[in-house]
């Protein structure tokens, strides 16, 4: 018997407008009424989930930032953070910069986004404190703070080729994935953490076994 449904958001449950369609929302509500727990599992940071809270009354959880954060939707608070150590991100950044010297690099904590390189703003910065700074300098100030996500964006490059080159360069230091269709944007984090890992830990803490979980998504980070 299924006790937990874990689903990606973008491209799976919601469209580009970040809205549930009535049929989808009705299905989720029916599952909850049947006693099934709903957990959203997304690459998005927790600060972007206000529209989800506004469309639902779920007193449940979301696994955010590719598994680095567990966020309680009902309480609107981050419960746990399992990010990457700053030294691993520093090593990865030192290796990637010479390979992609004109790229835009981004480093995220729960509430702050550090950016190195050109950017246009927009949704990626919504709800965050933004610091334009060379990332090695930013990492110098991390006194035990964990990196939620580290990203590299190389406009005009084929996403599959970019992912392969990044993985070849830093795959032994960090996890390497992507979550945006057709976009040359690679997401990196803790080598041992991903959506599946955090979901498994979450289910175990709630006494739910693997065969009682239904999970689905549409991108490599799923």
Language model feature labels by segment:
Residues 102-216, 220-222:
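Conserved acidic, metal-coordinating active-site core of Asp-based
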Residues 9, 44, 67, 217-219:
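Active-site metal-binding loops of divalent metal-dependent hydrolases
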Residues 4, 61, 214:
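Hydrophobic "anchor" residues on beta-strands that sit immediately upstream
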Residues 3-17:
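Asp-based phosphoryl-transfer active-site loop
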Residues 19-123:
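Active-site phosphate-binding/coordination module
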Residues 13, 35, 42, 207, ...:
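Conserved functional loop/turn residues at catalytic and ligand-binding sites
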Residues 13, 71-73, 78-79, 183-187:
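A short acidic, helix-capping loop that chelates divalent metal ions and anchors anionic groups
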Residues 7, 43, 64, 178-181:
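Conserved strand-loop elements at the edges of beta-sheets that form or border functional pockets
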């Amino acid at each position: 018997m299924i006790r937990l449904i874990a689903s990606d958001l973008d491209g799976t449950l919601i469209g580009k407008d970040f809205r549930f369609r009535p049929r989808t929302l009705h299905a989720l509500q029916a599952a909850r009424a049947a006693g099934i727990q709903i957990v959203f599992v997304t690459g998005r940071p927790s600060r972007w989930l206000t529209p989800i809270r506004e469309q639902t009354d779920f007193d449940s959880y979301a696994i955010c930032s590719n598994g680095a954060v567990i966020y309680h939707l009902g309480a609107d608070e981050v419960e746990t953070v399992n990010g990457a150590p700053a030294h691993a991100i520093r090593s990865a950044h030192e290796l990637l910069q010479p390979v992609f010297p004109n790229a835009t690099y981004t480093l995220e904590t729960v509430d702050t986004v550090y950016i190195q390189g050109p950017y246009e703003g927009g949704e990626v910065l919504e709800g965050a404190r933004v610091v334009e700074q060379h990332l090695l300098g930013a990492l110098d100030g991390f006194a035990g703070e964990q990196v939620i996500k580290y990203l590299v964006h190389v406009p005009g490059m084929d996403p599959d080729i970019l992912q392969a080159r990044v993985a070849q360069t830093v795959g032994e230091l960090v996890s390497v994935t992507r979550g945006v269709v057709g976009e040359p944007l690679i997401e990196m984090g803790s080598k041992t953490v991903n959506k599946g890992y955090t979901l498994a830990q979450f289910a175990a803490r709630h006494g739910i076994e693997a065969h009682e979980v239904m999970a689905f998504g549409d991108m490599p980070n799923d």
